[in-house]
Swiss-Prot record:
This is Inosine-5'-monophosphate dehydrogenase. Belongs to the IMPDH/GMPR family. Its EC number is 1.1.1.205. The gene is guaB. NAD(+) binds at residues 244, 294-296. Gene3D superfamilies: Aldolase class I. The active site is at residue 301. Keywords: CBS domain, GMP biosynthesis, Metal-binding, NAD, Oxidoreductase, Potassium, Purine biosynthesis, Repeat. It comes from the Archaea. PANTHER family: INOSINE-5'-MONOPHOSPHATE DEHYDROGENASE, INOSINE-5-MONOPHOSPHATE DEHYDROGENASE RELATED. HAMAP family: IMPDH. IMP binds at residues 299, 334-336, 357-358, 381-385, 413. It catalyses: IMP + NAD(+) + H2O = XMP + NADH + H(+). NCBIfam families: IMP_dehydrog.
Length: 476
């Protein structure tokens, strides 16, 4: 039996090359997420229930990346998370939330809380705009009475086709924050808010769809409701779907890809996880638009320990990237990234983007509450193949769990852990992107594709790795 050498990020360094780059701002981190989707920084937040829901996905898109909403929600809950992202940054909300004027004030309060919005357009029985109700109107109104009693009736509106500059002038002139767009019949066609205009200005590097809304992806499984879930997510506005399975080089994954592509041929579809060239080849033949690479490399993954299977991440990326390049299909490196240097190595090895989980877990935008232990703050971070995640998933799917059966039947390939509380994800993404920009400059590259052409790896010993770390000093 022949043994192949497998290397990961800590086994190698990139050899510095001549660079004509005088400032990191001269580098361009634009890259392909999938066949037809471009993002402005090469980072994707992992589809994990302790990493990505709408708050994380919004932050990722504003920074120029993309978030993948995890699938361990009901179909409607997951679709709502996608909708929240799309509504968070659209210059014009196409289907703004509205409520009938004869509904109670309590109905408006409940609806606004459920949708996490600050105001509602008010319509009559013919769906024509008759008013607007905001938090200010409802603040001291109590719960009795109808919306018609408290709404603002004299609403400033604009016609379809109004330009952004015209909308800004109208909002400023009338000192208002919301501008409904109505046609000649009084039917609502959209809504422009001052907040959305501000967001459009404040995040110039944001990744957006053709309508100017934040990019967002969502994960689906390979069993049960995956087609129904896919349809709901696409209808909600998901830009890309991710077929999410631990062993992506399997008939379950391949048949799911084919079925989704058959039902939704225009859907951008990512699938994984795989770790070999043949796995990439088979998924690409099935119709994927990007391949997610990484088996057992994540910080909370114990697949390699439990099953004995896996490929060191750098070798896996390099092997799969050769196949991806042959077919024009991007590769996503998923797992094992602990530093911006690791991300740079993954990109240099052929990945078009890097999926990150543990680095983003513990941030304000990740789901979950902050815990305090021994005077320090943490958040829970768990693998999606952990027992806790499996039980949570089954509870969502069936509405009940049998702990005895779950413990007997399930073999965990992930663990549940705590990661330090890190504050906002924005700062982490700035550091990651800045590190990769510096990495490009050391490789004499202005772009990620140019770095992949220039890249030269050198294998290092454990002594070389130790030399690469801070040493012979007492860290403060």
């Amino acid at each position: 039996m022949e043994f192949k050498e497998g290397l990961t990020f800590d086994d190698v360094l990139l050899v510095p090359k001549y660079s004509d780059i005088t400032s990191r701002s001269q580098t361009d981190l634009t890259t392909k997420l999938s066949r037809n989707i471009t993002i402005n920084i090469p980072f994707v937040s992992a589809n994990m229930d302790t990493v990505t829901e709408s708050s994380m996905a919004v932050a990722m898109a504003r920074a120029g990346g993309i978030g993948i909403i995890h699938r361990f929600l009901t179909i409607q809950e997951q679709a709502n998370e996608v909708l929240k992202v799309k509504r968070s940054g659209s210059v014009m909300i196409e289907n703004p939330y509205s409520i009938s004027s004869d509904k109670s004030i309590q109905d408006a309060l409940d609806y606004a809380e459920d949708k996490e919005i600050s105001g509602l357009l008010v319509v009559d029985s013919n769906s024509k705009l008759v008013g607007i109700v905001t938090e200010r109107d409802l603040l001291f109104a109590g719960s009795n009475g109808t919306i018609a009693d408290v709404m603002t009736k004299d609403v400033v509106t604009a016609k379809p086709g109004v330009s952004l500059d015209e909308a800004k002038d109208i909002l400023h002139k009338h000192r208002i924050e919301k501008l409904p767009i109505v046609d000649d019949s009084g039917i609502i066609q959209g809504l422009i808010t001052s907040k959305d205009i501000t967001n459009n200005t404040d995040y110039p590097n944001a990744s957006k769809d053709k309508k100017g809304r934040p990019l967002v992806g969502a994960a689906v499984g390979v069993k049960g409701d995956f087609l129904e879930r896919s349809e709901s997510l696409l209808n909600a506005g998901a830009d890309v779907l991710v077929v999410d399975i631990a062993h992506g080089h399997s008939e379950n994954a391949i048949s799911t890809v084919r079925n989704i592509k058959k039902a939704f041929p225009d859907c951008e579809l990512i699938a994984g996880n795989i770790a070999t060239a043949q796995g990439a080849e088979d998924l690409i033949k099935a119709g994927v638009d990007a391949v997610k690479v990484g088996v057992g490399s994540g910080s909370i993954c114990i697949t390699r320990v439990i099953t004995g299977s896996g490929v060191p991440q750098l070798t896996a990326v390099m092997d799969c990237a050769k196949i991806g390049n042959d077919h024009g299909i991007p590769i996503i490196s998923d797992g094992g990234t602990r530093t911006s240097g690791d991300a740079t190595k993954a990109l240099a090895a052929g990945a078009s983007s890097v999926m990150v989980g543990s680095m983003l877990g513990g941030t304000d935008e990740s789901p979950g509450t902050v815990l305090t232990k021994n005077g320090k703050r943490f958040k829970v971070y768990r693998g999606m193949a952990s027992l806790a995640a499996s039980i949570g998933r089954k509870s969502k799917e069936t509405g009940s769990i049998s702990l005895e059966d779950d413990l007997n039947d399930y073999v965990a390939e992930g663990v549940e852990a705590m990661v330090p509380y890190k504050g906002t994800v924005t700062d982490i993404l700035k550091q990651l992107a800045g590190g990769v920009r510096s990495g490009l400059s050391y490789c004499g590259a202005h772009t990620i594709p140019q770095m992949q052409q220039n890249a030269e790896f050198i294998k290092m010993s454990r002594a070389g790795f130790a030399e690469s770390q801070p040493h012979d000093v007492l860290l403060m």
